[in-house]
Amino acid sequence: MAELACFCYPHLENDSYKFIPFNNLAIKCMLTAKVDKKDQDKFYNSIIYGIAPPPQFKKRYNTNDNSRGMNYETPMLIKVAILICEALNSIKVTQSDVANVLSRVVSVRHLENLVLRKENHQDVLFHSKELLLKSVLIAIGQSKEIETTATAEGGEIVFQNVAFTMWKLTYLDHKLMPILDQNFIEYKITMNEDKPISDVHVKELIAELRWQYNRFAVITHGKGHYRVVKYSSVANHADRVFATYKNNAKSGNVIDFNLLDQRIIWQNWYAFTSSMKQGFTLDVCKKLLFQKMKQERNPFKGLSTDRKMDEVSRIGI
């Protein structure tokens, strides 16, 4: 994860801003510079290589002192930065919006995947600039639309029916922020279209998950798609989701947390996120991840796609 200010800076033109990508050498210069505390939040002028990110974001980059950041010297950083700028320059960003836009934290791996989709001549994003920009605006939180299959970050497709597409995420092969744990395996499920889904197609997906992925939990980060993760990583996902939800609420970024279909989501995760939305503490919510839930005999009998979040969330409280 990284702020958009780690990739580009704004230049005022008339009544709106044009965004310009950083280059590797400007970032490297900023990382070696000694900057006063009062200037940590200002864009850094490298003199030789142009503008660089504010020094307060140094930890977002991989250095000798910090191996968890982005590999900023790889060409992929420039590709991601250019893609972000193209998307932001396709809309109007005013002076009242620019600070909020640049402070937004985005998924670096998601954006690298969009670059890979853009470069794949067999992919629809290679052929459609409009769809590509739409995908980026969704990825950086500048669009309220959900990530559907056409605008998804991509990966290796392992299952598809009329309503859903399931992707195996390819973060191990990334250049900018690769997953270093070789045992990492995670999937994402996107809806092919943002519209009501028939029980038949939901049942097909659930059958696939139960037979092929019974060692994984189906969860959501509230953004309109499903994640299929190892049970051992669920607690880590819970910490991240809770922190993001609270930070958004604190900063005034009111984003609706989409609980998705209760029949697909792992019961304990549905209980966790439902309780989180009701304002319970992290400790109370996380207890629900480790409680035994009563399984409904037939989740399809008499059920619609309507959410019933309040019923589950108070179990064990």
From Swiss-Prot:
Q: Main site of residence? A: host cell
Q: Which domain of life is it from?
A: Viruses
Gene Ontology molecular function terms on file? ATP binding; metal ion binding; nucleoside diphosphate kinase activity; ribonucleoside triphosphate phosphatase activity; RNA binding
Against Pfam families, the record matches this protein to: Rota_NS35_C, Rota_NS35_N
EC class name: hydrolase
What are the positions of the active site?
A: 225 (for ntpase and rtpase activities)
Key words, A-Z:
ATP-binding, Host cytoplasm, Host-virus interaction, Hydrolase, Magnesium, Metal-binding, Nucleotide-binding, RNA-binding
Single GO BP term = viral genome replication
List required co-factors.
Mg(2+)
Please give the residue ranges the record annotates as the region RNA-binding: 205-241
Q: What does UniProt give as GO cellular component?
A: host cell cytoplasm
Q: Which Gene3D superfamilies match?
A: Rotavirus NSP2 fragment, C-terminal domain, Rotavirus NSP2 fragment, N-terminal domain
Query: Might you give the EC number(s) for this enzyme?
Result: 3.6.4.-
In this chain, ATP is annotated as bound at 107-109, 188, 221-223, 227
Protein location: Host cytoplasm
The record's listing under HAMAP family reads:
ROTA_NSP2
- Write out the similarity annotation: Belongs to the rotavirus NSP2 family.
Please give the subunit comment from the record: Homooctamer. Interacts with VP1; this interaction is weak. Interacts with NSP5; this interaction leads to up-regulation of NSP5 phosphorylation and formation of viral factories. Interacts with host DCP1A, DCP1B, DDX6, EDC4 and EIF2S1/eIF2-alpha; these interactions are probably part of the sequestration of some host SGs and PBs proteins in viral factories.
What job does this protein perform? Participates in replication and packaging of the viral genome. Plays a crucial role, together with NSP5, in the formation of virus factories (viroplasms), which are large inclusions in the host cytoplasm where replication intermediates are assembled and viral RNA replication takes place. Displays ssRNA binding, NTPase, RNA triphosphatase (RTPase) and ATP-independent helix-unwinding activities. The unwinding activity may prepare and organize plus-strand RNAs for packaging and replication by removing interfering secondary structures.
Q: State the name under which the record lists this protein.
A: Non-structural protein 2
Q: Which organism is it from?
A: Rotavirus A (strain RVA/Human/Japan/KU/1995/G1P1A[8])
